Design a protein with these regions (language model features):
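A structural signal for short, hydrophobic/glycine-enriched beta-strand patches
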Residues: 36-37, 52, 64-100, 109, ...
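Bacterial Sec-dependent N-terminal signal peptides
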Residues: 1-27
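Conserved, well-structured interaction surfaces
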Residues: 84-155, 178, 183-186, 200
Length: 200
């Protein structure tokens, strides 16, 4: 009799469970794109990607955008000296031996375009002039998109002073994930100026 009661009780308890398949501490993309509060979460995510460690090629320790950007922009310019050889990718940057399979090179590219995609999501979602808060978020999104394109162009394209017709970087100005060919340096810098002007 005890077993029957136990099975009956277990059946009632399990049958009354209402499983919540979506975690209550997370938002899905549809929920984020409904209002400016969601856009603010996306913008916060952009800033988090710039400072947080991300995993790339199996590495995550010290793998941050800001660290690698500093390594790849300052170390090759003789602004610092290393006392010995190291296996850290920072040495490769110092020795100008940067290849696409190094974690610092790949991390900057990956995080840079993730942030650009997130800013494009905000730009496509919010309507300019709807409120002061949405205009502020749009300004942030345009600024960060322009700034990220500038950082990527600085590291992966020929300098602007070498000519506007040189090959630049892929220019992403929408959330369309189609493969984009590399734009010319002049086109990239024109878009950077346009974004930064729009942000102000």
């Amino acid at each position: 009799m005890k077993k029957i009661f136990l099975f009956f009780f277990a059946g009632v308890v399990l049958a009354s469970c209402d499983l919540n398949f979506f975690p209550s501490d997370e938002l899905n993309s549809d929920a984020l794109l409904q209002d400016e509060a969601g856009a603010e979460y996306i913008m916060d995510g952009c800033y988090s990607l710039l400072k947080d460690e991300v995993e790339f090629l199996g590495y995550s320790s010290g793998n941050t955008f800001t660290r690698h950007f500093f390594q790849m922009s300052e170390f090759p310019a003789d602004n610092c000296n290393l006392s010995s050889h190291t296996t850290d990718p920072l040495y490769e940057a110092t020795a100008l031996k940067m290849t696409d399979n190094l974690k610092n090179v790949g991390t900057l590219w990956m995080v840079g375009y993730k942030v650009i995609y997130m800013t494009n999501t905000i730009i496509e979602t919010l309507v300019e002039g709807e409120s002061a808060d949405s205009d502020h978020l749009l300004g942030e999104a345009y600024f960060v998109r322009g700034w990220m394109h500038l950082n990527l162009a600085t590291l992966y394209a020929r300098p602007y002073s070498h000519g506007r017709d040189n090959i630049g970087i892929p220019l992403h100005i929408s959330t369309n994930n189609a493969v984009v060919t590399r734009a010319k340096v002049g086109e990239v810098y024109d878009q950077i100026v346009k974004d930064l002007t729009k942000a102000s």
